[in-house]
A protein has these predicted regions:
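A structural signal for alpha-helix termini and helix-coil/disorder junctions
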Residues: 56-59, 75-78, 91-94, 120-124
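Conserved, mostly hydrophobic/aromatic
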Residues: 1, 30, 85, 114
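Conserved short secondary-structure transition element at the edge of the structured enzyme core
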Residues: 31-32, 68-104
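Flexible C-terminal active-site loop/helix
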Residues: 94-128
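Catalytic alpha/beta core domains of metabolic enzymes, predominantly
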Residues: 2-79
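Residue-level marker for well-ordered alpha-helical positions
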Residues: 24-25, 83, 112
Length: 131
């Protein structure tokens, strides 16, 4: 089950039942608590980073990409997540400009702010690809 409230993943423990926090910022702690991973809209662009954090946890390595993963998520959280995702991805493929109400694309000022924040993190669609 997806836990967007962040109330379950720390407390609910049922055999053969997976809790998936709904934010990249909860991935590492969730894994430490026995969660199977995350389920989040922004994972469409953070999958590579999320996978690296997951793999490092499984392999008992230092989570070298967790801060960047959380920083990217935080950049998107400053706006409506779906609007931010579609606005970000629309530079690569115009199909992402198609959204249904009540969702809309970010206004130009907010889109520039989001892109600038992601650029400061050296995060691009190219860098987000799962290898």
């Amino acid at each position: 089950v997806k836990d967007s409230s962040y109330n379950l993943y720390e407390h609910l423990k049922i055999d053969n039942f997976s809790i998936l926090p709904g934010s990249e910022s909860k991935l590492l702690k969730g894994l430490e608590l026995g969660c199977a991973g995350i389920i989040t809209a922004t994972c469409n662009v953070t999958a590579g980073l999320s996978r690296k954090v997951y793999d490092d946890f499984i392999e008992k390595k230092e989570p070298t990409k967790n801060k960047m993963l959380c920083d990217v998520r935080n950049a998107f959280e400053k706006f409506n997540l779906i609007s931010g995702l579609h606005s970000f991805m629309s530079d690569e493929d115009e199909i992402y400009k198609n959204v249904l109400p009540p969702v809309s694309l970010l206004n130009e000022k907010d889109k520039i702010q989001l892109i600038n924040e992601l650029n400061k993190l050296n995060f691009t669609l190219g860098s987000s690809k799962v290898v």
